[in-house]
From Swiss-Prot:
This is Apoptotic protease-activating factor 1. It comes from Mus musculus (Mouse). The keyword Repeat applies. The lineage of its organism: Eukaryota, Metazoa, Chordata, Craniata, Vertebrata. The CARD domain mediates interaction with APIP. The monomeric form is autoinhibited in a closed conformation through a bound ADP at the nucleotide binding site. Exchange of ADP for ATP and binding of cytochrome c trigger a large conformational change where the first WD repeat region swings out, allowing the NB-ARC domain to rotate and expose the contact areas for oligomerization. It is found in: Cytoplasm.
Length: 1249
């Protein structure tokens, strides 16, 4: 019955007892079904009318709302209108078994039952936790009137009591399962006398009529019996709720076949009792949204209006209901103390977060401390040892076995006690267990045991050293990942500086750790412990950090590269090089192949960090506003977020259904926007990676997105192929403004520094400026006109304006289109400066430095350039990417800039350290002569001059000539020959540099040139399909003309013969003296890409774009064998010296080794693909060469690889800085190798002795 109805009945009880006659009234109530015949007899048995009336009213008080309404109607019907009027104000609005009132859907029946049972009311500030409440109710339904236990357990302050009360605040549950009522008993930590008092009070509550006994039970056993009888006879189908049970022995007093719901921190308390048991674990946190909701209710603000500190408070306490409520209550009194309470929480000052409340403890540390104090004395120290664990780290059992020097089973038993008492959490992973502490428990332990922490960390390290050697940890060990991630942390925290330096400066440790977890965490440790490592040796620390940062894109790939070989590429002064060389020599004794890069002194690495977060092209990357993070997106449809200093991955989000084209941080760094070819724009929470909004109003792919620069009112601008710009307000679900005006795709947009204007670039050849407030066009600048010549009709010229960037003062803007960067004054639209980057590349992207006059420009030929806009001079040339650079961006302070490329990497460069524009870069046209003690290289540089380089000494002689297209050295280094783009051929005599010119040149660019063995004759081929034989000493010429298309290449044979092959699919054998064809082989339907000649000159091989290779005899016009099976163009081939084997390489990165005699395939050498869709061998295999003993094969592709011919396995890989190697020159003894990559870097490699 409602409390209001009951009060009304009690208030007018005396008047009713005096006046009413019960017999007729009871007839009405029996007919209504609210009074039984037996109850009528009880009333009638009373002696007087007054006693009969008193007995009826007592019965009605024990009934529900229906009885009250029936009694009221009976009074009216029997003429007691005055008495009925007294009861009218107490009439319930609804009956007990139907309908709900307005208070959260709780019926008056529920409210009455809970009030009578002593169930606590909802807290003043309350948020629902529907999932957990439903889980508890499901377990209660399972009791179904039968005896049993439902246990709600969790750590201190997680809201167990509130959840228990909320679970029984349900009409159908009470009516269906617990019609006898609910009885709440607060237990807490009790001794026997305290428990007896609780039981006495409960028995008295349940037997208010004292029908079973006139006195209270004298001991626990008697109380247990009394309780059993009361529950069975007077309160069947009722629920007993025991709140905050600590000890198993307490429950034995209630183990008398009741239905019991209990809350506890120790889930093992029910182990001591009988009957069915159900368990509901309570997560320690509310979740971000629920936590914010509680704070907003306490301070009476909207969730979205809460300050940033509110989010940090929730994050810091992991949504602990107790902490959020304590802080909320304090903020209600002191609304300006957000920062103060956040600081106390961060500093673990729990004593200062104190507030009186309905909870038993005024501060979190009190609530947690009592749990620890209740542990057995013999395991308290073990719990103290957990003080050194880090937040959110799951620790395998084996780690604690090492720490405590105990067997696994013993450790699991100890830890299970902590888990049972909600002092520790456990994750089961297959057969093994991992344990972790809640953040607040970590904070509590850290604060409580602060004076012991250093010793505890030292104990951890010492125990590790007893069990393991750092680099011998095996990946199949349960605890190996923990030690790799946290051993350095324990050493640093233990003040064990010597041990930390020895660990971090060990190439063995670097190798073992990077192979398992990649380089980012190690870089983070070098940054974090730099102050300690620098004490030992600042230079060594820098050596290792630079090694990891610049090789990160390799160290994160599979198969894992040989770290010793990578270390050998470091400068000779580096500690990494010293250790690598030592290891290489030790392993070399066992036959392991290692290579020394002997000319590496001339190479400077300019990048500060190289990361490879994507598995496909990276289209865009950007810094966060604080410069600490980088977001990137690309063709793999993902958004990646990582630390700008170390490359540590923070978020990996499958963002869109198609390529992600652009991403941007909001000005407060709270959000990241992405836009995609799937036509959608998405907003993500930058901390959690949670999707916040999806906008899909563009009708074509969305190319760009950019947030306003100020955070007071966040707007996002997007541009699309649908020709429109759109402005989005993150507080709205739909587009705020659409801007019309462009007549072609919008490629790029940027807000001005003051957010007043929005600049947009389009394929229509214009830059437009828009007023952000009105969304009206303010100005249009026709960029296209700066690319028109007088004879070109404007409609025939397409100028795509790629991007734009504002100057820091907002008065100027740079625009990139084709191969020019233009600087405009936004007030006058006048052109202030023009930068021309050259004819051979297009500008992909540009960015203006925030603090000086530098602009960084990304070019299509893999290069990035820094220009001074004022002086219009190039300041730096940054090479390192292996493919198109799609995006560049300065950091907010301008000290560094990033570049994003098609090669799947992002590089971070320090602005001040990038090299000045003085480096001369080599082209891939080289010739090599190997001498006994020297390797001489003739190379063409980017100025098209010639360089003669002594490999070992590094001495360079410059032979400047313009437009050199190919070159060669005579066998004895007496002469240099070269051809140019115009078809001319010249010879330079060394060392006097006298020049001889061919009187008859080629009509087109010379592509190949070669001296005969005696150096007297020079043979050349060109794009004009003619081979020229020039005896330059006599001036005689022979022209070999028969090929129908360009000659691909040629080789000299014995007896004045020459083998040539062509795009026309033929191979021809010539007599170079007479110029006649001796043999004409029609080899392939496609282009003949290469030929190789056996050492006995009886056979040759041909490879083709038709994916086949063939073996031929010079005596037969039909092939001996056709070699099929390659899935790409077969680009190269080589015979072994003994003529038994032939190796072929294709465009898929596969090398095949064949038996020459029968054409059978012996081995397929295909490196494991790094990522799905990535070419093996880093690209096309362009050259192969056997060792003299035919046991080893070297191949060139994206990098160099050495193979064991007998097994087909890779024996070494040398990763060049660049890629797309065209050829490898190998010394006769197979110990020196020379090549040039596409960055123009020369590699002279020698087998390490």
């Amino acid at each position: 019955m409602d409390a209001k109805a009951r009060n009304c009945l009690l208030q007018h009880r005396e008047a009713l007892e005096k006046d009413i006659k019960t017999s007729y009234i009871m007839d009405h109530m029996i007919s209504n079904g609210v009074l039984s015949v037996i109850e009528e007899e009880k009333v009638k048995s009373q002696a007087t009318q007054y006693q009969r009336a008193a007995a009826l009213i007592k019965m009605i008080l024990n009934k529900d709302n229906c009885a009250y309404i029936s009694f009221y109607n009976a009074l009216l019907h029997e003429g007691y209108k005055d008495l009925a009027a007294l009861l009218q104000s107490g009439l319930p609005l609804v009956s007990s078994s139907s309908g709900k009132d307005t208070d959260g859907g709780i019926t008056s029946f529920v409210r009455t039952v809970l009030c009578e049972g002593g169930v606590p009311q909802r807290p003043v500030i309350f948020v629902t936790r529907k999932k957990l409440v439903h889980a508890i109710q499901q377990k209660l339904w399972k009791l179904n009137g039968e005896p049993g236990w439902v246990t709600i357990y969790g750590m201190a302050g997680c809201g167990k009591s509130v959840l228990a009360a909320e679970a029984v605040r349900d009409h159908s549950l009470l009516e269906g399962c617990f019609s006898g009522g609910v009885h709440w008993v607060s237990i807490g930590k009790q001794d026997k006398s305290g428990l007896l008092m609780k039981l006495q009070n409960l028995c008295m509550r349940l037997d208010q009529e004292e029908s079973f006994s006139q006195r209270l039970p004298l001991n626990i056993e008697e109380a247990k019996d009394r309780l059993r009888v009361l529950m069975l006879r007077k309160h069947p189908r009722s629920l007993l709720i025991l709140d905050d049970v600590w000890d198993p022995w307490v429950l034995k007093a209630f183990d008398n076949q009741c239905q019991i719901l209990l809350t506890t921190r120790d889930k093992s308390v029910t182990d001591s009792v009988m009957g069915p048991k159900h368990v509901v674990p309570v997560e320690s946190g509310l979740g971000r949204e629920k936590g914010l909701e509680i704070l907003s209710l306490f301070v009476n603000m909207k969730k979205e209006d809460l300050p940033a500190e509110a989010h940090s408070i929730i994050k810091e306490c992991k949504g602990s209901p107790l902490v959020v409520s304590l802080i909320g209550a304090l903020l209600r009194d002191f609304p300006n103390r957000w920062a103060y309470y956040l600081r106390q929480l961060q500093n673990k000052q729990f004593k200062r977060i104190r507030k009186s409340s309905s909870y038993d403890y005024e501060a979190l540390d009190e609530a947690m401390s009592i749990s620890v104090e209740m542990l057995r004395e013999d395991i308290k120290d073990y719990y103290t040892d957990l003080s050194i664990l880090q937040k959110d780290v799951k620790v395998p059992t084996k780690v604690l076995c090492v720490l405590w020097d105990l067997e696994t089973e013993e450790v699991e038993d100890i830890l299970q006690e902590f888990v049972n008492k909600s002092l520790l959490f456990c994750n089961r992973n297959g057969k093994s267990f991992c344990y972790y502490l809640h953040d607040l428990q970590v904070d509590f332990l850290t604060e409580k045991n602060r004076s012991q922490l250093q010793d505890l960390h030292r104990k951890m390290v010492t125990q590790f050293q007893r069990y393991y050697q750092p680099h011998t940890l095996s990946p199949d060990q349960e605890d190996c990942m923990y030690w790799y991630n946290f051993l350095a942390y324990h050493m640093a925290s233990a003040n064990m500086h010597k041990e930390l330096c020895a660990l971090m400066f060990s190439l063995d440790w670097i190798k073992a750790k990077t192979e398992l977890v990649g380089p980012a965490h190690l870089i983070h440790e070098f940054v974090a412990y730099r102050h300690i490592l620098d004490e030992k040796d600042c230079a060594v620390c820098e050596n290792f950090q630079e090694f990891l940062s610049l090789n990160g894109h390799l160290l994160g790939r599979q198969p894992f590269p040989n770290i010793v070989q990578l270390g050998l590429c470091e400068p000779e002064t580096s500690e990494v090089y010293r250790q690598a060389k030592l290891q290489a020599k030790q392993e070399g004794d066992t036959g392991r192949l290692y290579l020394e890069w002997i000319n590496k002194k001339t190479i400077k690495n300019l990048s500060r960090l190289v990361v490879r977060p994507h598995t496909d092209a990276v289209y865009h990357a950007c810094f966060s506003q604080d410069g600490q993070r980088i977001a990137s997106c690309g063709a793999d449809k993902t958004l990646q977020v990582f630390k700008a200093e170390t490359g540590e991955k923070l978020l990996d989000i499958k963002a869109h259904e198609d390529e992600v084209l652009c991403c941007a941080f909001s000005s407060d760094d709270s959000y990241i926007a992405t836009c995609s070819a799937d036509k959608k724009v998405k907003i993500w929470d930058s901390a959690t990676g949670k999707l916040v909004h999806t906008y899909d109003e563009h009708s074509e792919q969305v190319n760009c997105c950019h947030f306003t620069n100020k955070s007071n009112h966040l707007l996002l601008a997007t541009g699309s192929n649908d020709f429109f710009l759109k402005l989005w307000d993150l507080n709205q679900k739909e587009c705020r403004n659409t801007m019309f005006g462009h007549t072609n795709s919008v490629n790029h947009c940027r807000f001005s520094p003051d957010d007043e204007l929005l600049a947009s670039c389009s394929a229509d050849g214009t830059l437009r400026l828009w007023d952000v407030r009105s969304a009206n066009e303010r100005k249009s600048i026709n960029v296209k006109r700066f690319f028109l010549s007088s004879e070109d009709p404007p409609e025939d010229v397409e100028v795509i304006v790629k991007c734009c960037s504002w100057s820091a003062d907002g008065d100027k803007i740079i625009v990139a289109a084709k191969n020019k960067v233009l600087l405009f004054d936004i007030h006058t639209s006048g052109l202030l400066a023009e930068i021309h980057t050259g004819h051979h590349s297009t500008i992909q992207y540009c960015d203006f430095s925030p603090y000086d006059h530098l602009a960084v420009i990304a070019l299509s030929q893999y290069c990035v350039e820094l220009w001074n806009i004022d002086s219009r001079l190039k300041v730096a040339d940054c090479r390192g990417h292996l493919s198109w650079v799609h995006g560049v961006m300065f950091s907010p302070d301008g000290s560094s800039f990033l570049t994003a490329s098609d090669d799947q990497t992002i590089r971070v460069w320090e602005t001040k350290k990038v090299c000045k524009n003085s480096a001369i870069v080599l082209k891939q046209e080289i010739d090599v002569v190997f001498q006994e003690n020297e390797t001489m290289v003739l190379a063409v540089d980017n100025i098209r001059g010639l360089q003669l380089i002594a490999g070992k000494t590094g001495q360079i002689d410059y032979l400047p000539e313009a437009q050199v297209s190919c070159c060669c050295l005579s066998p004895h280094l007496e002469y240099v020959a070269f051809g140019d783009e115009d078809g001319a051929i010249k010879i330079i005599e060394l060392p006097n540099n006298r020049v001889f010119s061919s009187g008859v040149g080629h009509k087109k660019a010379v592509r190949h040139i070669q001296f005969t063995a005696d150096g007297k004759t020079l043979i050349s081929s060109s794009e004009d399909s003619v081979i020229q034989v020039w005896n330059w000493q006599t001036g005689d010429y022979v022209f070999l003309q028969a090929h129908q298309e360009t000659v691909k290449d040629f080789r000299l044979l014995q007896d004045s013969r020459l083998l040539s092959w062509s795009f026309d699919g033929t191979v021809k054998v010539w007599n170079v003296i007479t110029g006649r064809i001796e043999r004409d082989f029609t080899c392939h339907q496609g282009t003949v890409l290469s030929c190789a000649i056996s050492s006995d000159a009886t056979k040759f091989s041909s490879t083709s774009a038709d994916k086949t290779a063939k073996i031929w005899s010079f005596d037969l016009l039909s092939p001996l064998h056709e070699l099929k099976g390659h899935n790409g163009c077969v680009r190269c081939s080589a015979f072994s010296l003994d003529g038994i084997l032939l190796a072929t390489g294709d465009d898929n990165g596969e090398i095949r080794i064949w038996n020459v005699s029968d054409g059978q395939l012996l081995h397929s050498c295909a490196p494991i693909s790094v990522e799905e869709g990535t070419a093996t061998h880093g690209g096309w295999v362009t050259d192969v060469c056997f060792s003299p003993d035919s046991k080893t094969l070297v191949s060139a592709g994206g990098y160099l690889k050495w193979w064991n011919v007998a097994t087909g396995d890779s024996s070494q890989t040398f990763y060049t800085n660049g890629t797309n190697l065209k050829k490898i020159h190998v010394s006769p003894d197979f110990r020196t190798y020379v090549t040039v990559d596409n960055l123009g870097i020369l590699y002279i490699l020698q087998v390490l002795e």
